[in-house]
Amino acid sequence: KLQLPTLDDPVPIGIAPAIT
């Protein structure tokens, strides 16, 4: 699961850049 964290799909396994 390599995608950006979204409201529908929270941060995956911590590999995606957190947009905060």
UniProtKB/Swiss-Prot annotation:
<protein>
    <recommendedName>
        <fullName>Unknown protein NF007 from 2D-PAGE</fullName>
    </recommendedName>
</protein>
